[in-house]
A protein has these predicted regions:
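Non-catalytic RNA-recognition surface used by pseudouridine synthases
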Residues: 102-107, 111-211, 215-233, 237
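Short, charge-patterned binding micro-sites
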Residues: 37-69
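A domain-level signal for the structural core that forms small-molecule/cofactor-binding pockets
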Residues: 21, 94-97, 161-163, 170
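Ordered, amphipathic secondary-structure segments that act as subunit-interaction surfaces
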Residues: 61-115
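Single conserved hydrophobic/aromatic residue that forms the stacking wall/gate
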Residues: 241, 245-251
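Ordered, soluble secondary-structure elements with a strong preference for glycine-centered loop motifs
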Residues: 15-19, 72-77, 125-129, 186-190
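Hydrophobic, proline/glycine-rich low-complexity stretches
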Residues: 1-7, 13
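N-terminal ordered "arm"
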Residues: 10-38
Length: 251
């Protein structure tokens, strides 16, 4: 059986890197008595894969990993068991049963929602209205949004406008806050800080990455009709009244 788990990450845990988070959840799953399947062979390991690695320093409400299990308790009991093993800064919020033919989350990721805000002690160079006018001028009203994208071996000009699905400016504690939905995944992956940095440059402003807190809200897959669906909605919750399920018994 395939299970998809959703979790939140905040506070000091935002400084824990992806590989350490993988090891953390491997231990947590074992201690929570989740009946996870192991690979075959001499160096057997848990069958677990994460959807989209989160950068160090970024908080999130929408992190995912998939596991294969032999049997499972209900969604409610499984979340409780996992959260009993969590430290402050990590909370499991979802646990759903996937179809037998479901693809791994990491291969499905197509987009993600982010909120970028100014950290305490840092001020925005523009007011909310000035940001809205600048984004309209340089992004929405422009036929393209060409930036220089650097790779390990080279750099090239890229029009990232088609890869930014949503971009708005909001107010939070009387400060501007940016909401973005951007292309994410193995094919076209755009980091939200890259977009904001490019906007700063178009406005002739100096960008300070230390001033910005990035928060990932959700991660999506793309359905056959082109619309987006959050990864958790691709599965079903396991009824709390059901008995412990195994691979030959599905509700």
């Amino acid at each position: 059986m395939k299970i998809r788990v959703k979790f939140k990450k905040w506070g000091c845990m935002k400084f824990i890197g992806h590989l350490d988070m993988m090891r953390y959840f491997q231990k947590a799953v074992r201690r929570a008595d989740i009946d996870i399947r192991y690979s075959e062979g001499y160096s057997a390991h848990q069958i677990m894969s994460f959807a989209a690695p989160l950068g160090v320093g970024i908080t999130s409400d929408g992190e995912y990993f998939d596991i294969d299990v032999n049997t499972t308790e209900s969604t409610e009991k499984s979340i409780q068991a996992l959260n009993a093993q969590m430290v402050d800064g990590v909370e499991v919020t979802g646990y759903v049963l996937l179809p037998d033919d479901a693809k791994k989350a990491m291969s499905l990721v197509a987009a993600a929602d982010y909120v970028l805000s100014f950290k305490e002690g840092y001020e925005s160079p523009y007011t909310i209205e000035e940001w809205k006018e600048a984004i309209d001028k340089h992004f929405f009203d422009a036929p393209s949004f060409v930036v220089m994208k650097k790779t390990k071996k080279s750099e090239r000009e890229v029009d990232i406008k088609p890869l930014v699905y949503k971009l708005t400016v909001m107010e939070n504690n009387k400060k501007p806050e940016f909401f973005m939905q951007v292309s994410t995944g193995s094919i076209d992956n755009i980091k939200p800080e890259f977009v904001l940095h490019a906007i700063y440059e178009k406005c002739g402003l100096d960008y300070n990455p230390l001033a910005i807190q990035i928060h990932r809200q959700e991660v999506y897959a793309r359905k056959d009709d082109g619309t987006l669906i959050c990864l958790l909605d691709m599965g079903e919750e396991i009824d709390r009244k059901s008995t412990r399920l195994n691979s030959s018994h599905r509700t």
